[in-house]
């Protein structure tokens, strides 16, 4: 109203009409505002009642939620205490189980170690048993061979007596043959001076053949075995009527040399046999004592590893091949026509 300008009136009627119209206008506006206010008040009362009802519901819900919150807090505290108690018990149980596991592992390692030691000891005992069995079998075999060899040497001792007689006779015949050969050589020297050149050459060839035959070491095995024991008719004594041929003289000398070598070989073998019999008796007594001690020590729990090699492996059996005098590297070679004597 202040902003509206009051018009100028020409007459009082116009001014009265203007103010009447304006009052009616304001009155209508007042009526409309009153109606709106009544409607607003009614709506606000309804809204207030509704809000109060909602507030009551909200307060009730809030109280319920607070009660639930308190209950949940109590449950949380209870569960927390239970969890801590359960965690402490679980920690103690885990600690006990870890201790039991460590002890069980230690016991398991000890048992594995003990099993390995038992297996190793069992293997060592089995190896010692096999070595002992093999050594005993080898010793029995060599003992049987030695017994057979002793029997064979005893038979050769019997043959030696007859051979000595034959050798002595052949020595006498060889001495006579050498004397006769010396006489023949002197006769050939005399005849060589008076004979022509061609007979001289023949005599020289004959002398060289005789000297070569005398320097021969031994006859072959076949010839030696065939002519080892000649009959008295094959070798005369040098004083008979029929002279010996050069080939007969050479074969007789070779037979004598072979017999002398055989006699020497038999003497060396007899000495070796005596030494072997002495060593065998000493070894037999030592082996029996060692076998009894090894059988008594086999009842123990363990064998040290170096002790598993028995006496038979080192000295008792190999002594036949290495340490026995007369039977090892210094064994004489067998004479032609005779069997070798070896264990």
Curated annotation (Swiss-Prot):
- InterPro entries, per the entry: NUDE, NUDE_dom
Some GO term, biological process aspect, for this entry: which one? Answer: regulation of neuron projection development
UniProt-annotated stretches for the region Disordered? 184-204, 322-343
Q: Which residues form a coiled coil?
A: 25-190
Q: Which GO terms describe its molecular function?
A: microtubule binding
Query: What keywords would UniProt list here?
Result: Coiled coil, Cytoplasm, Cytoskeleton, Microtubule, Phosphoprotein, Transport
Database matches in PANTHER family = NUCLEAR DISTRIBUTION PROTEIN NUDE HOMOLOG 1, NUCLEAR DISTRIBUTION PROTEIN NUDE-LIKE 1
What is this protein's function per UniProt? Required for organization of the cellular microtubule array and microtubule anchoring at the centrosome. Positively regulates the activity of the minus-end directed microtubule motor protein dynein. May enhance dynein-mediated microtubule sliding by targeting dynein to the microtubule plus end. Positively regulates lysosome peripheral distribution and ruffled border formation in osteoclasts.
Q: Which family does it belong to?
A: Belongs to the nudE family.
UniProt name for this protein? Nuclear distribution protein nudE-like 1
Source organism of the structure: Gallus gallus (Chicken)
Lineage of the organism: Eukaryota, Metazoa, Chordata, Craniata, Vertebrata
Gene name as annotated: NDEL1
